[in-house]
């Protein structure tokens, strides 16, 4: 369920201060944050955030298409290694036990 329009988008106060400071100085410095829950505002377009995914910081360059989404959407927390394959088929096709 989307957030009420009357409330406005949520963004952590400390992150908003960093965004405003970066805009005032036109600095291209990466803004490090743990705040995955903060909404991306139009003021943050063109900035790069280092969003924590639980293990490391993932660099996220903000574009216009990202406005309205949360920072955490662009820093995946889980790594998908793929489903296990059929081990019998691998051996029969030409593994060490084949021909």
Curated annotation (Swiss-Prot):
Residues 77-99 are annotated as: Disordered. One of its GO terms (molecular function) is rRNA binding. Keywords: Ribonucleoprotein, Ribosomal protein, RNA-binding, rRNA-binding. It comes from Sorangium cellulosum (strain So ce56). This is Small ribosomal subunit protein uS19. One of its GO terms (cellular component) is small ribosomal subunit. The keyword Ribonucleoprotein applies. PROSITE patterns: RIBOSOMAL_S19 (PS00323). Protein S19 forms a complex with S13 that binds strongly to the 16S ribosomal RNA. The gene is rpsS. Belongs to the universal ribosomal protein uS19 family. SUPFAM superfamilies: Ribosomal protein S19. InterPro entries: Ribosomal_uS19 (IPR002222), Ribosomal_uS19_bac-type (IPR005732), Ribosomal_uS19_CS (IPR020934), Ribosomal_uS19_SF (IPR023575). The keyword tRNA processing does not apply. GO terms for biological process: ribosomal small subunit assembly; translation.
